[in-house]
Amino acid sequence: SIKDRNVLQIQTLKRNNWNVTRVFAVNYYNNPKREIKRIKDLLDRITGRDKKTGSGIAKAQKAYKCANVSQLFETADYVTSGDNDAEIVSRLKAIVGAEEPISENFLIRRTLSTLGILKFGNKVENRMLALIPLCGFKREKLLGEFYYRKTDKPVTFDKYRVETGEKAVRRYETDFTPYEIIALIKAALEDKVALYTEEIASVACAALRLQKVTDKFAAYINDCVTLGEERGLFVRSVSDRISLA
């Protein structure tokens, strides 16, 4: 069937460590030089002779834009008293507007940090969880975590963000959204064609300017790869090599 020929056969080859590319007869007939060059470029990437290695990673990168909010130095009572809800909601909206998409956990920590509250307990967290729905954000649940955004525009897996300042605001694995991690993986695979999951973790760690690949970060990368497989973006071979679908 058409599905066997165009989908299942190709996925089977990729799962068995084949590097697969399509050459359509009509494209070759109309422009054979272009198609031959495309195949040569693919072979150069596979053999490591491509001088443009890393271009996909660079192209998919953009700067992380932090919200412009004033820094306060308050205590936990500022949040739990209920007297400052309007100010807290305003900060939540400003942060999501500038830094979307953003995980629920990071949104809470990020907002509290602008209030000078770096350590907090369940009472403060529950109050923040009660205020977030008042903002009217759009949200999507991925890998067990809610990710918020201000706009209705669907989030794509095309760009990942890198912080340019000396002090990074993102510290934990879910601070880097699955949208960004999948975009980074796609870019890496455009450069390298196929990679093992541990190689992807190393590439991601370097691209995001993290000090080292922790066990939690490696597990998170693997979860994002699995999500990419479910979305039809990646194919995992029997030897655990990942390639673009």
What are these regions (language model features)?
Residues 37-59:
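Non-catalytic C-terminal interaction segments of nucleic acid-processing enzymes
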Residues 53-245:
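C-terminal non-catalytic scaffold/interaction domains in large multidomain proteins
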Residues 27, 32, 46, 210-215:
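Basic, low-complexity terminal or inter-domain segments flanking catalytic cores
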Residues 1-42:
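Basic, amphipathic alpha-helical patches used to engage nucleic acids or provide basic targeting signals
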